């Protein structure tokens, strides 16, 4: 759904943690009651947080649960520059949305959906995530090869005042063909013409790495992940039928500088941010060496040429050609909000 948005000429004058709670009374009784519930119940029991060199355990937990948390993936300097870039882009994006309508529900946004390239790889702070000394060995271990490729990178953020849950969802599907105005559009890439297998039966084809630029806690909108659902054929529960244990299956506590490595098929969703800080989780996304979907050009040539040899190999399918310029900026509609969000 696309909504007409009002611009916000004053957001530039606000600090990053003053941009939320627009049109929402954080002192309302129902908000305070929900906040208390989150403080009491949020957080996956026994959540393990690994160091980057614990490769065997990282891979085991990733394949068991469909996600894994690794701390100290970003150095202090890398964390600082990435957070500053996120803060800058949040302000730019909000300048188009005075009422904080969002593009993933009120006070909730996808960087990539808002971006005219579909990604944020035109920012060197995002591009550096393609080849981190701490992350590359993990991705090579998960895929069993260093020849995986980048899909791009964006991520999301939720503002203080995001009081609603995002429905559980998955970021993949079987191939779907849609006819529109005489043209056929294909979404997804895997289809078994025999009707025996579907994308959930495959080894991990597509991984998203979400980086924490602030500590993840019970009330600042931590992502919720339902362990072991990456291969599930059961229908995801609708939000109004979702049991409380799923709503509280949040990835917290986890420190800033960590990465949440996700098999995108696993059920996940956003949770309320009733804190006083913006929670952003910028990401990079990778495909297994054997998997492909349509790829969008999103890495400017000068940034591509600044990458390491491995970084260039990973990003070669999304890099601009020599002399090619990219249309960089945010859509006025911020990309619109998908149905159900």
What are the language-model segments listed below?
Residues 74-76, 155-158, 173, 215-218, ...:
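Short, solvent-exposed loop/turn segments at secondary-structure junctions
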Residues 3-48, 231-243, 250, 259-261, ...:
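Non-heme Fe(II)/2-oxoglutarate
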Residues 153-155, 209-211, 282-286:
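A structural signal for short, well-ordered beta-strand segments
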Residues 2-65, 71-189:
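Non-heme Fe(II)-dependent double-stranded beta-helix
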Residues 122-128, 196-198, 246-250, 269-271:
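Active-site rim elements
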Residues 164-251, 293-301:
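Catalytic core of non-heme Fe(II) oxygenases with the double-stranded beta-helix
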Residues 255-256:
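Residue-level recognition of short, solvent-exposed, well-ordered loop/turn junctions
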Residues 69-71, 148-152, 208, 222-225, ...:
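A structural signal for short, well-ordered beta-strand segments and their strand-loop junctions
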